[in-house]
């Protein structure tokens, strides 16, 4: 056992506000990034749609787009009219033909065949490495 607790800043802020104001969490800080005119992080009320958040970021810069809720590595594909929940943290707007979108929409049988190989030469690790090590 390590004996360490890890909290993100928003969680600590929510605990503080709950203790001081005795109120529930009614908003989340959300980052809207990718193919939008003005990538932003803003405080959004729970229940607002991703489409409304995209409009707050100036709209998309591509006509045919897909959304990923969460980060590029562990996020999931979502729809524009899905809503912000207490676990939301980011929305990535990407062209529908982007590698991160096509990778998440591939059939399970194809993905299983790729998993049998050590490397499928997709370059995903190289593209997403934050330190450009690969």
Model region roles, listed by residue range:
Residues 1-48, 56-63, 71:
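Hydrophobic alpha-helical positions that pack around
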Residues 27-29, 39, 64, 88, ...:
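Active-site lining segments that contact anionic ligands and/or coordinate catalytic metals
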Residues 42-44, 56, 78-82, 103-104:
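Short acidic, glycine/serine/threonine-rich loops at helix termini
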Residues 53:
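Donor-nucleotide binding loops and adjacent catalytic segments primarily
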Residues 65-84:
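Short acidic beta-strand-loop surface patches of small beta-rich interaction domains
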Residues 84-101, 133-134:
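Non-heme iron-sulfur electron-transfer modules
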Residues 101-123:
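Ferredoxin-like iron-sulfur electron-transfer modules
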Residues 124-134:
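Iron-sulfur cluster-binding cysteine motifs and their immediate structural context
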């Amino acid at each position: 056992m390590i004996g360490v607790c890890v909290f993100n800043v928003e969680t600590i802020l929510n605990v503080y506000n709950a203790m001081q104001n005795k109120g529930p969490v009614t908003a989340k800080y959300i980052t809207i990034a990718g193919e939008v005119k003005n990538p932003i992080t803003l405080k959004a009320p729970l229940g607002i749609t991703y489409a409304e958040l995209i409009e707050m970021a100036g709209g998309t810069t591509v006509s045919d787009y897909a959304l990923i809720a969460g980060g590029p590595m562990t996020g999931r594909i979502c729809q524009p009219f899905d809503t912000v929940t207490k676990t939301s943290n980011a929305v990535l707007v990407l062209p529908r033909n982007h590698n991160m979108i096509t990778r998440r929409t591939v059939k399970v049988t194809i993905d299983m065949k790729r998993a049998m190989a050590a490397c499928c030469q997709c370059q995903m690790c190289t593209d997403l490495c934050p330190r450009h090590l690969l």
